[in-house]
């Protein structure tokens, strides 16, 4: 700690910080532009000037840039000094000479750091009356709009995009006061993290193009604390709504998880919530017609189905909340509950849980990954399957430069000096995958091989680290030298990290990763292990347990159950089409609960219109084992026209539908009237989920008697927004499930004792930089702790080494193994329904080694077809020199190419008949 003196007052601060960060952490306001907590200091904008004095007796002092000045013990500064204030105002005036006065039409208005800083410095009158420099804007793709004329040349965008996210296609061009930030030519930004430019940019140069189409000011939207539903990482988000539509998603700060950044799929992939073809009312099939029902009618109809059924099973979903899966389990009974996950995938998830619980290996939070100094990734194309983890790994690799700088006593925030000292030095990163990955640019070595061979390499590394681990007898000689290099790097690291997951479709690769981690732990290393799962709640559903989807389908095919309830699950993604069809042909009554129209609904008798994440509350468990609550953003019924009952929205949380059905079926009163009741019942029945109670406060939580506001206090137009429906303003929706209010009424103070924050706003801070006001220390944890609770902690380490080493892959003529390829834009079930994501999705393809292509007599672009898992695929050929012969790569998860094809065999690959 250090003691500094600011305007005559004494403060204790972190001596490792610079003065800007220290003062902001104290709650003192110093304007700034180029500095960012995650990007460090470069002193480019000169906006954060303060007066520094030599000692208490010095009355003259000198101007210094607070972001470039260490907070050393005994520092005396003044923020309010008249010279410093005048200098800061003049800096804004310089910046404004070329900045257009277009706030009323700028999409950043009301969410703009430049506006905040201009007001903070007191600059309110423009003296510049001459020509402004102007630029041509670029088309940067479907996600981001570009308006270069608003640029103040703070350099944040390129520092984030190039230096932090390792993007290569955004740069700065020009000189002196005429610089241009963009691409060499128009084109889609290639980085999977480009959307963060929207929040990193302090002005309106980069804005959310998906928001532009249905634009609202920040103060006119309703927000809620939420969790990204698009992968297993569990990034915290702030979705914003107006007029019953999601308008945008912003990053929500969580110091333990995603902190300031998220991936583009999570930010822009929300369009499926706004689709017009969503089921918005319950429907029942009568003859060949679908009849719309009200809630009471559909509950009676569903209860009659259950009463007449010989046996009913429930099929859950890894994209549904814990509460919804538990409600289905309670309805059908634990013995009749099936997870909706394919048997192989479920086995891999249970294996990962076993390692997490019994392996004795620590699983780091997402933010902690950045502190590791050697990383081995086995079988995951991490940028496509867990993108935000990939961004953290990039920071871990860059940690080498920080380590070198620290040895020379350079402060951690002196980023320009750190980069100069580091000269692109990196901590070692080793990657195995079936083909190239998006992280190859920072890897020390890449091993491209079939999945079984990747697992064998992992087992060999474990044995080289610890001879008591099982050996790989016939390892390829060419790999032994590489194994030695990897072993040397991992063993020499202070904190090695092993990353793997379920997407490779292999138990062996998970076991190999566990063996490597155990071998390192036996050597005394502070080792970590991170698993990547396939869906937002895969880990949570695995903790609930239940039969696999394969078992459920077998039961239905044999006729042992004649009715099924399928909740938020398109079975065709998790099982072969012919097996699903055969099973459902034997089902007398199929009840489907979902918020999206899926192929399974074509075979349903009854459809219950569920609420999406934006219209519901629930709990998810991420790949780390962290339980996190997401909250309802808006009530869709508020916008219903009472004169048009046929268009009324009847969308309830899946758990509400299922519990209501349970109560109707058993002729008893509804027990679960609010979310807290479900959670209490869940933890009583499933003690392993006990911690979810602490994931968020209950519905009775208040701050000084107030609920928490979902909307900023400047929210406007409430009395007019339904005027086209009725001039009579209805009562605002009442939230019985959470401590939030569906309005601006309530507490939104940055100083309030809460972790769940719907939106970032503080007096004088309207932009995302307002998160500074919610943090215990700027860039650290939130003031009252980061939300979420870990359900799994490393045990004593009772797990033995795994010894099921697979045989080496052998290519066989006329027989190919499907190798998994994943795409951030397209492989995930929900986001692929969004229009803007579809613009970034690749055309489906089959990847073939050139030698195999020559043997087949096909070329690049040739259409080939083959049968697999009960369906015929017809796809154009792509060629890859680095895909091992004997394999065909498929973009798993894209429409029509289910993920369960991973590892399957293809025997009849042939050129398609034109």
Curated annotation (Swiss-Prot):
Cofactor(s) recorded in Swiss-Prot or TrEMBL: [2Fe-2S] cluster; [4Fe-4S] cluster
Binding site for [4Fe-4S] cluster 3: 228, 231, 235, 263
Catalytic reaction equation(s): a quinone + NADH + 5 H(+)(in) = a quinol + NAD(+) + 4 H(+)(out)
UniProt xrefs under Pfam families: Fer2_4, Fer4_Nqo3, Molybdop_Fe4S4, Molybdopterin, Molydop_binding, NADH-G_4Fe-4S_3
Enzyme class: translocase
Single GO MF descriptor: NADH dehydrogenase (ubiquinone) activity
Superkingdom classification of source: Bacteria
GO cellular component entries: membrane; oxidoreductase complex
Entry's Gene Ontology BP terms: ATP synthesis coupled electron transport; respiratory electron transport chain
SMART domains: Molybdop_Fe4S4, NADH-G_4Fe-4S_3
Catalytic activity, EC: 7.1.1.-
Transmembrane segments: none
Cofactor binding description: Binds 1 [2Fe-2S] cluster per subunit. Binds 3 [4Fe-4S] clusters per subunit.
InterPro entries the UniProt entry points to: 2Fe-2S_ferredoxin-like_sf, 2Fe-2S_ferredoxin-type, Asp_de-COase-like_dom_sf, MoPterin_dinucl-bd_dom, Mopterin_OxRdtase, Mopterin_OxRdtase_4Fe-4S_dom, NADH_UbQ_OxRdtase_75kDa_su_CS, NADH_UbQ_OxRdtase_ferredoxin
Function according to Swiss-Prot or TrEMBL: NDH-1 shuttles electrons from NADH, via FMN and iron-sulfur (Fe-S) centers, to quinones in the respiratory chain. The immediate electron acceptor for the enzyme in this species is believed to be ubiquinone. Couples the redox reaction to proton translocation (for every two electrons transferred, four hydrogen ions are translocated across the cytoplasmic membrane), and thus conserves the redox energy in a proton gradient.
Similarity field: Belongs to the complex I 75 kDa subunit family.
PANTHER family: NADH-QUINONE OXIDOREDUCTASE SUBUNIT G, RESPIRATORY NITRATE REDUCTASE
UniProt name for this protein: NADH-quinone oxidoreductase subunit G
Organism: Yersinia pestis
Gene designation: nuoG
């Amino acid at each position: 700690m250090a003691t500094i003196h600011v305007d005559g007052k004494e403060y204790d601060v972190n001596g490792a910080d610079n003065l800007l960060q220290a003062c902001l952490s104290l709650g003192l306001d110093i304007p700034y532009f180029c500095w960012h907590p995650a990007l460090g200091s470069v002193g480019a904008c000169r906006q954060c000037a303060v007066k520094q004095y030599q000692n208490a007796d010095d009355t003259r002092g000198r101007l210094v840039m607070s972001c470039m000045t260490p907070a050393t013990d005994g520092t005396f500064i003044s923020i309010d000094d008249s010279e410093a204030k005048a200098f800061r105002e003049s800096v804004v005036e310089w910046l404004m000479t070329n900045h257009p006065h277009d706030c009323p039409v700028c999409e950043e208005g009301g969410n703009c750091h430049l506006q905040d800083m201009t007001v903070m410095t007191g600059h309110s009158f423009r003296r510049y009356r001459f020509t402004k420099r102007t630029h041509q804007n670029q088309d940067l793709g479907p996600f981001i709009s570009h308006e270069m004329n608003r640029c103040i040349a703070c350099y944040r965008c390129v520092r984030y995009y190039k230096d932090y996210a390792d993007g290569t296609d955004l740069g700065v061009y020009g000189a002196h006061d005429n610089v241009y930030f963009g691409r060499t030519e128009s084109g889609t930004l290639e980085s999977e993290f480009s959307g963060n430019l929207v929040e990193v940019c302090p002005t309106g140069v980069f804005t959310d193009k998906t928001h532009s189409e249905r634009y609202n000011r920040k103060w006119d939207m309703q927000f809620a604390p939420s969790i990204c539903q698009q992968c297993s990482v569990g990034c915290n988000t702030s979705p914003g709504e107006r007029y019953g539509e999601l308008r945008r998603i912003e990053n929500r700060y969580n110091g333990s998880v995603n902190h300031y950044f998220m991936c583009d799929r999570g930010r822009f992939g929300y369009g499926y919530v706004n689709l017009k073809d969503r089921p918005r009312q319950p429907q029942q099939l009568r003859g060949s017609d679908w009849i719309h029902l009200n809630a009471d009618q559909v509950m009676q109809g569903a209860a009659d189905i259950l009463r007449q059924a010989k046996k009913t099973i429930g099929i859950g979903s890894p994209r549904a909340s814990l509460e919804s899966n538990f409600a289905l389990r309670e309805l059908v009974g634990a013995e009749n509950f099936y997870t909706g996950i394919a048997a192989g995938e479920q086995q891999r998830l249970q294996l990962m849980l076993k390692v997490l619980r019994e392996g004795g290996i620590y699983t780091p939070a997402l933010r902690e990954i950045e502190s590791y100094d050697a990383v081995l990734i086995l079988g995951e194309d991490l940028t496509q399957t867990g993108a935000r983890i990939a961004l953290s790994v990039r920071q871990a690799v860059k940690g080498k430069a920080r380590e070198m700088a620290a040895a020379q006593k350079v402060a951690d925030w002196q980023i320009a000096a750190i980069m100069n000292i580091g000269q692109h030095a990196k901590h070692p990163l080793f990657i195995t995958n079936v083909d190239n990955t998006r992280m190859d640019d920072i890897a020390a070595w890449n091993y491209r091989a079939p999945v079984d061979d990747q697992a064998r390499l992992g087992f060999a590394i474990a044995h080289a680290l610890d001879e008591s681990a099982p050996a790989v007898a016939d390892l390829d000689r060419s790999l032994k030298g590489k194994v030695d290099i990897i072993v040397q790097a991992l063993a020499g690291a202070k904190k090695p990290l092993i990353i793997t997951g379920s997407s490779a479709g292999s138990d062996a690769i998970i076991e190999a990763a566990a063996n490597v981690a155990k071998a390192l732990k036996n050597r005394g290393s502070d080792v970590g292990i991170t698993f990547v799962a396939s869906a937002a709640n895969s880990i949570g559903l695995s903790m609930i347990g239940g039969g696999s989807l394969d078992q459920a389908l077998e039961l239905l095919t044999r006729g042992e159950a004649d009715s099924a309830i399928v909740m938020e699950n398109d079975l065709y993604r998790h099982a072969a089409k012919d097996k699903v069809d055969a099973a459902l042909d034997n089902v007398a009554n199929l009840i489907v609960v979902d918020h999206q129209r899926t192929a399974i609904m074509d075979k349903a008798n009854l459809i219950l219109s569920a609420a999406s994440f934006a219209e519901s509350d629930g709990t998810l468990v991420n790949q780390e084992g962290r339980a996190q609550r997401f909250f309802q953003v808006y009530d869709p019924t508020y916008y219903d026209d009472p004169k048009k009952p046929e268009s009324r929205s009847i969308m309830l949380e899946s758990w509400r539908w299922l519990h209501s059905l349970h109560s109707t079926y058993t002729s008893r009163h509804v027990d679960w009237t609010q979310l807290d009741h479900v959670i209490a019942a869940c933890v009583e029945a499933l003690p392993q989920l006990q911690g979810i109670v602490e994931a968020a406060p209950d519905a009775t939580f208040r701050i000084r008697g107030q609920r928490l506001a979902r909307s900023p206090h400047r929210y406007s137009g409430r009395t007019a927004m339904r005027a086209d429906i009725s001039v009579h303003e209805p009562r605002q929706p009442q939230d019985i499930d959470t401590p939030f209010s569906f309005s601006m009424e309530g507490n939104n103070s940055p100083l309030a004792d809460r972790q769940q924050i719907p939106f970032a706003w503080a007096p004088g801070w309207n932009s995302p930089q307002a998160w500074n006001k919610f943090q215990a220390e700027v860039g650290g944890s939130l003031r009252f702790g980061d939300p979420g609770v870990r359900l799994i902690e490393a045990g004593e380490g009772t797990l033995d080494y795994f010894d099921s080493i697979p045989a080496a892959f052998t290519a066989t003529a006329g027989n190919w193994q499907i190798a998994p390829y994943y795409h951030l834009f397209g492989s995930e079930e929900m986001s692929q329904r969004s229009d803007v994501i579809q613009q970034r999705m690749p055309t489906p393809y089959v990847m073939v080694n050139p030698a195999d292509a020559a043997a087949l007599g096909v070329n690049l672009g040739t259409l080939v077809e083959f049968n697999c898992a009960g369906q015929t695929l017809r796809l154009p050929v792509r060629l890859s020199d680095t895909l091992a012969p004997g394999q065909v790569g498929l973009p798993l998860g894209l429409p029509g190419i289910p993920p369960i094809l991973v590892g399957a065999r293809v025997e009849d690959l042939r050129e398609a008949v034109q």
